[in-house]
């Protein structure tokens, strides 16, 4: 079983069960200010799980690219990944627990698909609590399929309950499916909750059955949904009998290339192996970010900061392997070899990806040189041979100088570092960053408030107004919306004049004043294109799409949501117009209530 074969088997199975295959979304979420990247297969589908009508129907299947940055420092072991793929199938009110469980069981055990022995399957269900009853319904389905009671575990909310995101919203019990790997039990008490590796969690089916209200009550939903997820890389490792995802075809070509560049052989020395795993993971993630969005480039903010960190961490660990020359672009072909047949954007943007990686690589080499000069300058005036923690942290935080490099220089110049002091400053920095991250995340996976909905509609008016003022070459390259403002990136090579900005504002505000209705239609993509509907440049769309028309003024392919009439928007005001990147301009704008 290979990466490509498992993807295809999963999609083909659910298509045979009348599910419609939808395209996975970009890693960079569109119009979702609450997260930097799509972190789960269900994230792009949140509006539809909350009640929006999906243009492709109520039974869906897809493969979603995901990127999680919370565990970047953990990457390097045998299991953690930054970039990964999630296989998922969805029911938006079409079916519920029984059919979901039966489909999962068939895919896992059928000789036409994964052919896993039924006798090796274990499952868990929600045990219930004071507010929500035990999920005996799911347990009975498993029993009917031949899973004995002693292999059905009833576990707490911490194990078998999903959501809500934030303090209220859709949520429900889940059932997790495990496979006995055949390893010896670590103890007499060893079971599916144990982390020894005997039991492999292969699938998770979430049943969105309740809505939690502001008072903490769980109310049964009329329209119940199913969201399932199977991690592609982890499942491939299990099916191939490998102890690590890095020993599979998801990584082998990259690792082989690193071996050639470094002269090190993977599997001979653990310190070298860890470096190789970090490089292969981080460069892969960086390639997918760059392939997905020409708006994101290495920087010190948001998505750009994550991209920069991935690239620079790769360079740092390459240095430990003894790689002294530029090497990042040399790995892109290996990544394309693995993924290019399924993700053609890697092939289409290969030259761009190589250029961006090489540019950032060159910048970091300069940073290392400047950091060394700063190190010499600082240590020259120290009263002792110990570098205080705050100074070591300053080199890290202000100059982007990795601690490990400071440590190497300290050894070279005969200094020690107050590591305890550095760690204290670093932990404070992490807490501050985490608070900021939590603030973003707790807003929900998709912040569909009335304020953001108004601003989303305003971006459609802005897009059309920019075309009328600047020309038809204007195309949206990305947007970001919070409750306070919109940010809109578009193709245009020159700075806008004050007169052009004024004209755009006047056009948008005229459409607001004219009280134009906003209507949604579902049609085939080809039909939308014939009608002249604008679409996000570079985005992949399903055959059936949602199209929003602002009465005779604007027509765009868009997932929504939007207000019903432009008179709900207030007054549109552009606060700032600036360069985003080469050939891309950025506008920040607000709506002022009447």
UniProtKB/Swiss-Prot annotation:
Annotated EC: 6.1.1.7
Domain of life: Bacteria
The keyword Manganese appears for this protein: no
Entry keywords, A to Z: Aminoacyl-tRNA synthetase, ATP-binding, Cytoplasm, Ligase, Metal-binding, Nucleotide-binding, Protein biosynthesis, RNA-binding, tRNA-binding, Zinc
Gene Ontology biological process: alanyl-tRNA aminoacylation
InterPro entries for this protein: aa-tRNA-synth_II/BPL/LPL (IPR045864), Ala-tRNA-lgiase_IIc (IPR002318), Ala-tRNA-ligase_IIc_anticod-bd (IPR018162), Ala-tRNA-synth_IIc_core (IPR018165), Ala-tRNA-synth_IIc_N (IPR018164), Ala-tRNA_ligase (IPR050058), Ala_tRNA_ligase_euk/bac (IPR023033), Thr/Ala-tRNA-synth_IIc_edit (IPR018163)
CDD domains, per the entry: AlaRS_core
Keyword field contains Protein biosynthesis: yes
The record's free-text note on cofactor binding: Binds 1 zinc ion per subunit.
Single GO molecular function: tRNA binding
Binding-site list for Zn(2+): 456, 460, 558, 562
Necessary cofactors: Zn(2+)
Gene Ontology cellular-component terms listed: cytosol
Intracellular or extracellular location(s): Cytoplasm
Reaction(s) catalysed by this chain's protein: tRNA(Ala) + L-alanine + ATP = L-alanyl-tRNA(Ala) + AMP + diphosphate
Family label: Belongs to the class-II aminoacyl-tRNA synthetase family.
Role this protein plays: Catalyzes the attachment of alanine to tRNA(Ala) in a two-step reaction: alanine is first activated by ATP to form Ala-AMP and then transferred to the acceptor end of tRNA(Ala). Also edits incorrectly charged Ser-tRNA(Ala) and Gly-tRNA(Ala) via its editing domain.
HAMAP family documented for this protein: Ala_tRNA_synth_B
Domain remark in the UniProt entry: Consists of two domains; the N-terminal catalytic domain (in this organism this is shorter than usual) and the editing domain; the C-terminal C-Ala domain found in most orthologs is missing. The editing domain removes incorrectly charged amino acids.
UniProt-listed NCBIfam families: PRK01584.1 (NF002436)
Protein name: Alanine--tRNA ligase
């Amino acid at each position: 079983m290979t990466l490509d074969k498992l993807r295809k088997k999963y999609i083909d199975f659910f298509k045979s069960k009348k599910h419609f295959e939808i395209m996975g979304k970009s890693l960079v979420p569109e119009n979702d200010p609450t997260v930097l990247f799509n972190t789960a297969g269900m994230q792009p589908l949140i509006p539809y799980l909350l009640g929006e009508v999906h243009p492709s129907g109520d039974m869906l299947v897809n493969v979603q690219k995901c990127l999680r940055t919370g565990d970047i420092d953990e990457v390097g072991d045998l299991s953690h990944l930054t970039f990964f793929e999630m296989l998922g199938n969805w029911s938006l009110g079409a079916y519920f627990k029984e059919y979901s469980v039966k489909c999962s069981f068939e895919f896992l055990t059928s000789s036409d698909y994964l052919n896993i022995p039924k006798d090796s399957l274990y499952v868990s269900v929600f045990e219930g609590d004071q507010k929500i009853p035990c999920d005996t319904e799911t347990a009975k389905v498993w029993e009917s399929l031949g899973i004995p009671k002693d292999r059905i575990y009833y576990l707490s909310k911490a194990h078998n309950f999903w959501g809500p995101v934030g303090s209220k919203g859709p949520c429900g019990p889940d059932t997790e499916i495990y496979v006995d790997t055949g390893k010896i039990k670590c103890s007499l008490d060893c079971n599916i909750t144990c982390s020894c590796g005997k039991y492999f969690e292969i699938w998770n089916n979430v049943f969105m059955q309740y809505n939690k209200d502001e008072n903490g009550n769980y109310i049964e939903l009329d329209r119940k949904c199913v969201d399932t997820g199977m991690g592609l890389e982890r499942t491939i490792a299990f099916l191939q009998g490998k102890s690590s995802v890095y020993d599979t075809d998801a990584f082998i070509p990259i690792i082989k290339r690193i071996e050639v560049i470094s002269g090190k052989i993977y599997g001979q020395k653990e310190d070298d192996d860890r470096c190789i795993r970090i490089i292969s993971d981080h460069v892969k993630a960086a390639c997918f970010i760059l392939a997905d969005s020409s708006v994101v480039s290495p920087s010190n903010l948001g998505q750009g900061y994550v991209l920069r960190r991935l690239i620079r961490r790769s360079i740092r660990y390459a240095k430990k392997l003894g790689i002294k020359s530029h090497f990042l672009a040399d790995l892109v072909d290996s990544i394309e070899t693995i993924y290019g047949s399924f993700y053609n954007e890697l092939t289409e943007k290969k030259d761009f990806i190589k250029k961006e990686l090489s540019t950032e690589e060159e910048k970091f080499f300069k940073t290392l040189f400047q950091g060394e000069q700063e190190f010499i300058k600082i240590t020259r005036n120290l009263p002792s041979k110990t570098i205080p923690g705050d100074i070591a942290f300053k080199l890290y935080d202000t100059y982007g100088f990795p601690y490990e490099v400071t440590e190497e220089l300290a050894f070279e110049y005969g200094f020690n570092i107050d590591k305890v002091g550095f760690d204290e400053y670093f932990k404070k920095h992490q807490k501050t960053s985490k608070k900021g991250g939590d603030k973003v995340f707790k807003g929900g996976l998709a912040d569909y408030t009335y304020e953001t909905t108004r601003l989303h509609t305003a971006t459609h008016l802005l897009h059309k107004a920019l075309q009328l003022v600047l020309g038809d070459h204007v195309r949206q390259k990305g947007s970001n919306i919070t409750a306070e403002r919109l940010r809109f990136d578009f193709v245009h090579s020159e700075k806008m004049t004050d007169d052009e900005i004024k004209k755009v504002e006047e056009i948008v505000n005229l459409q607001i004043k004219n009280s134009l209705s906003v209507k949604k239609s579902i049609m085939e993509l080809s039909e939308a294109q014939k009608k002249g509907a604008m679409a996000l440049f570079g985005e992949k769309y399903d055959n059936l799409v949602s199209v929003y028309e602002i009465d005779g003024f604007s027509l765009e392919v868009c997932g929504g949501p939007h207000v019903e009439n432009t008179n709900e928007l207030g007054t549109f005001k552009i606060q700032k117009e600036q360069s985003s990147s080469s050939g891309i301009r950025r506008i920040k704008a607000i709506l002022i209530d009447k």
